[in-house]
Amino acid sequence: MNIYDFSNKLYTLKDLAALSEYLHGQNCVGISTIKKRLQRGETDLDEIIKPKVKAFTEIDYSPIFYVADFETSSNLETNECGAYLACVVKANFNKGLSTPDSWDVVEPCFDCRYPKDLGDYFYTLYKQAEKRKKKTLIFFHNLGFDFSFARNWESLMGQLMITKSFSDGSNPWRLAFGDGEKVWLEIRCSLKLLHRSVGSIGDMIGHPKLGYDYNEFRLPTDKLEKYDYEYCYNDCKVTACGIMEECKNWFWIKNIKDIPLTFTSFTRKNNKAILSSELEKAWSNYCVDTFPMNFDQYQIMRGVYQGAYTHANTFFRGKLCTLVHSFDVCSDYPSQSTQMDFPDTNGELYVNEPLWNLWNGLYEECIESSLLDDVEAIKMRHVLVSGKMFHGIFTLKNIKIKNYGYNYMPIISASKTKSKDGLGEIEYNKKSHGYKLLEEMVSEYNRLIDNGRIISYDECTIYATEVDIVNILKMYDVESISAECLFLNHAKSSGGINELVERNIIYANMKTALKAISNGKHPDETLLNSIPEKWLSDIKSNAEPKKLAKRYLMLSKNMFNAQYGIDATQLVFGDTLIDEDCITSNTESLSRESFERYYNETMIKLGKERSDRGLFKRVKSSYIVGIYITAYARRHLVLFSHLIFTKTPYIIVYWDTDSAKLYHPNESAVTFNKLLNVVSKFNNGVMERCRKSNHSQVQENKWGLGKFDYEETYAYFTALNSKRYMAFDGELDVKTSGLVQATMKVSVVLDYLYKNSESWLLSFKALMRIMWKTNTMFDQSVSGRTYLDRQNQGKWSDEFGQYCGAVIKNTDYEFKMPMKKGLFWTNEKSACLHYDEVSEYVFGNKLDTERTTFYMFDEGIGIVYYLNGKRNIMFCPCDISKFKHGILLSDSMSDLTEDLA
């Protein structure tokens, strides 16, 4: 037996093959390949066990592309959704570009009742493409959802190939099917490409989306009317036409091969077109040469980016409020990039440095002056740290929210706090508090939290920029701050990163000019020059210039917002995995080796070759700019909220980074006018800041970015926590991470409830109960094999379940058992345990309670949990008759233990 020595460790060929399988999964290499590499004289262990790199041969695309769509029906009682119809249309892309109305080149080509049949049709297209040697494109308008049914595409799934551009970390936006060397069929997400709903696309192209009755629950075995098919085909035609009409806006798109994967790609390519070659080259060189990134700094920056401020006021959670005013910031994130300072170096590293030393004794002066006025804050930074900026890991001792009462909003996310075990271990330990009083929310760490936000803490360690630290000092009393690991940067004022700022100002001016034209006004020459010549020519020659300007306005908004996405895009995602029919990108598994390989070899190497692909990839290395844009947007909200707290009687019942919902229990016309005056004063300060910044010379009355605009007043409003609120004022606005609006229309739910209610208000309250009360949402008749994966896939429990896939909607509240009363039973240990006990009893250490979910089915309990940073799935067969709606009926653990044993 041959023994090989690597770094003083001995391996056999079998050991090396096992190591390759452990590190690379299904892409691993076998013993024969490893043996050949050793015989060639390879000495690097990583090179010996790394996967084979398959060269993908570039082939031409067929000009014929397809758009497919599923029609789904939701069961309100079980929250289960299944497909009952699929339609496909095809179009000639080249003809669509040259035809005034591309609607005429789109034609229906296939429909079926079961997802499996659609998979067979796609396999036929795959074989045709392989025979003709032309790649075929297919679009779904929400591939992340529609691909939930793809596990029934048995004939096609064997050709699935994993490519680097597969997933954005959550849902797939490109699926490649091929023979191992060449890709013959691509399925892409048109929603990622267009950033619009089908209804919005229809309005834009003049072919509106049809109306449809979603109240009726339909199955694949039900007879459908002609209109059902027309509706589905129309959605496909609208999407296909929208793709071609979008591509007409860009002069550099000549054929189907030029269609980018996402809308951000549109913007990246347009950047190169609108900036001079010298500026584009300078910007690309600047990002790479100035910000060489290492793994540790990237992990810190990812931590800094986490911890959004989205939050609901704990004193008003679940309560029905009337006359709630909504204020929204116009292009909050990208507007910050046109006004603020950014780092101009990668940063000098400091370790275990007291923050006071870096701030040269001006700490108190900073607290007193810079937080009172946003303009002063800009000036104070340069006095404070001599024009330096910093980000890193900070330890805060004895922190406590300043204003405990109705009008306070904590901003330190519990998910952003870090344990003392190491840089990579995030400590969540967030309790499922429900509606308990705040005084009861004390954990064993002397931490007081409110719905995932820190109220007080003896000691916590967080990732932050100095902007975040200033935000914290405004909202919290802090005994001391020290920096465990700090990157100190020089702040580049007087224009900041000129290329970045110039690029964003062009988009800002474009948006402002198009808004003026769509309102029948004539913008000045400076603003007009920012509009692309083709767009301006089309508007002038169009019979309805305001309507066309509005269409281009929406496009410019998406481009402007995409700029923030470009800057804040993560540099490296984890490996793409296939697990139980579910395809995910495991961001938790990012290793130092993976980062170094991707960042240094791919981004830097390709960038220095000055290829187009390299230049675009290098733009992503402005990640640090995205971090500061986010921090500035958060500070914008903190300053606004502090003004509301101190200058008005209004209460913020809900906020996210670019909006706030304000409520006054005894409002009058006087108090509302006072509120508007205070908001107006704040907006004037934004204009002053913009004028004093050296990034751009703007006319105050022409620049509307960064202002808090009054949107509307809701007759009824209620919020539970982050990203979960409902508002009603004639039309229902629902934002929730649990109720999927695309598949369970809230208007349908209201109609359903209205039949049993006397008013819309009663319906609204009933919908609150359905959305946010566990015991009204769970139905233990749900049965059938369940795939506990990222999409929570399931199967309909009926006679045609083998043909029709169904998904249980991704949610953070349905089927979720309270942690204190949650039961856990395994085949190895015939016992029921409290959740707090099971962590160490079964797994040996604490589970991540924030991301552990229990799912109940007739056959037993499914658990999706995270352990040591990895997602695991366990299904425990057991008798769930002792449960009702996820709540333990009996307090006697011994009774249940005997039953299950």
What are these regions (language model features)?
Residues 98-220, 224, 230-238:
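Conserved DEDDh/DEDDy metal-dependent 3′-5′ exonuclease domain
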Residues 199-285, 637, 658:
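Acidic, Mg2+-coordinating catalytic module of metal-dependent nucleases/exonucleases
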Residues 16-23, 901:
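Short alpha-helical "recognition helix" segments of helix-turn-helix
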Residues 147-156, 244, 330-345, 666:
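Short active-site loop/helix that positions an aromatic residue
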Residues 21-36:
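Short, basic interhelical loop/turn and adjoining N-cap
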Residues 63-74, 325-327:
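Two-metal-ion RNase H-like nuclease active-site motif
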Residues 53-64, 126-131, 302-325, 642-646:
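A short acidic-Thr-Gly-centered motif at the start of a beta-strand
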Residues 247-316, 400-652, 662-901:
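C-terminal, non-catalytic extensions of nucleic-acid polymerases
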